[in-house]
């Protein structure tokens, strides 16, 4: 059995790490490189960096900090932000990233997924899915351009259909960003995760809602996700990654201990 992964998420805006609630009202957390170093030292299995306004601004992620991060950490990391072509991806990978993640650009042009997978291999192509539960309809829908609340829009894609589509096109991993739970710290949306797990045959990463160690345990034990991504509990030092991994190991979760 592959070890489960603990993945801190660093949302980047204007060169600094920020964090919002339900993808809004972002506050500055700190500088990118020191935070990356801290999480690597605490025992993170990998890191994810989202340049949250790159797609909505029509630009590619700022590559200068990508190379600085690669110089100071020795764990895998994934970068997302405005990647619209194999050339964009090639540059980011050449600066030291191990994986690239696409989200809004894939919704704008789904062929991008297969073009990237064909060139670089599915192992380094992650698709992020920003999913929102509409209480009125009882449905989960995919959102686009979520880094800029003035441009965020609901797409025609229902979440489960998009999960199936991106796998068909070559996604090697899916990060499910559950927007209703983002930054609230009241637990992952286990019901949605179960629905997605049934149709997701590639590694599935849960994102949005972690507030306690038990929340991570529930995602691994009850849904069998492959990794759990979180931000605010790590940024605000509510949970220490080393302590979390020891807790999970004691509960029988296969995890890499520091």
Swiss-Prot record:
Keywords annotated in UniProt: Amino-acid biosynthesis, Cytoplasm, Histidine biosynthesis, Lyase
Pathway: Amino-acid biosynthesis; L-histidine biosynthesis; L-histidine from 5-phospho-alpha-D-ribose 1-diphosphate: step 5/9
Subcellular localization: Cytoplasm
Record GO terms (molecular function): imidazoleglycerol-phosphate synthase activity; lyase activity
InterPro entries for this protein: Aldolase_TIM (IPR013785), His_biosynth (IPR006062), HisF (IPR004651), IGPS_HisA/HisF (IPR050064), RibuloseP-bd_barrel (IPR011060)
Chief subcellular location: cytoplasm
Enzymatic reactions: 5-[(5-phospho-1-deoxy-D-ribulos-1-ylimino)methylamino]-1-(5-phospho-beta-D-ribosyl)imidazole-4-carboxamide + L-glutamine = D-erythro-1-(imidazol-4-yl)glycerol 3-phosphate + 5-amino-1-(5-phospho-beta-D-ribosyl)imidazole-4-carboxamide + L-glutamate + H(+)
Signal peptide start-end: none
Active site: 11, 130
EC number: 4.3.2.10
Record-stated family: Belongs to the HisA/HisF family.
Quaternary data: Heterodimer of HisH and HisF.
This protein's name: Imidazole glycerol phosphate synthase subunit HisF
Species: Serratia proteamaculans (strain 568)
Gene name in the database record: hisF
